[in-house]
Design a protein with these regions (language model features):
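Short helix-loop-beta connector
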Residues: 50-57, 149-152
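Short, glycine-rich nucleotide/cofactor-binding loops
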Residues: 57-67
């Protein structure tokens, strides 16, 4: 779910990935007008904005991990008029970034309360700080020059498992309490790939003795 429920609609983003089960089905099989049987949303990842609250929030996402963050950020900034949000978002390049236009629009709407930090792994940038992947080393580097991680009341992390594990460890090391760090894991194991295996067996003669007989 990638939009705030306050808009009265439910929008779901699906990014097809190599070996993905549902993502490939959604891309190739689901068509406009189809009726789908769905369950209620699962898990406890998210945040319920409170109009009277003034908070500082952090989101760390990579790739399609931006999906729940967009809903959380837009709902929080719309409801909590004095709260601030920082998004650290990792992608291969600006062209591969999901919701690039939506994020730009959100930044234009809340220029003083939303900070966007984009990290690109396959795009040449003037600053080495913004080049590479989001990992523990990158977050510690950001802490030295650009981001005060101790200021945040809540942190939300979503993306590849390795990134999430390193980000969680880095935030703890940088002073954030564990209870303030929330993770969303939605990856599933890839579909097993069938392989043809050739086995070459050399003939061997074996004598088996049972009850004294060969």
């Amino acid at each position: 779910i990638c939009r705030s429920t306050a808009c009265g609609e439910i929008s779901v983003a699906v990014k097809a990935i190599e070996g993905g089960r549902f993502s490939r089905y959604a891309r190739d099989e689901i068509k406009p007008g189809m009726a789908l049987e769905v369950m209620v949303p699962q898990g406890h990842f998210g945040y319920q904005p409170q109009a009277e609250r003034e908070g500082h929030y952090l989101a760390i996402a990579a790739g399609s991990g931006i999906t729940p963050m967009l809903a959380i950020m837009s709902a929080t900034l719309a409801t909590e008029a004095h709260s601030h949000f920082t998004l650290i978002y990792g992608n291969r390049s600006s062209q591969s970034m999901m919701f690039r236009r939506a994020l730009a629009d959100l930044k234009d709407k809340y220029p003083q309360r939303l900070q966007l930090i984009s990290i690109f792994s396959q795009e040449t940038l003037d600053s080495d700080l913004l080049h590479g992947r989001i990992d523990g080393e990158k977050l510690h580097a950001l802490a030295k020059t650009l981001v005060n991680f101790r200021q945040y009341d809540e942190a939300f992390i979503c993306g590849p498992s390795a990134m999430m594990d390193e980000a969680e460890a880095a935030l703890k090391a940088l002073g954030m309490p564990e209870k303030a760090i929330h993770l969303e894991r939605f990856n599933t194991p890839g579909t097993p790939v069938k392989r043809t295996v050739s086995v070459q067996a050399d003939g061997q003669k074996v004598t088996v003795r049972q009850d004294g007989r060969d």
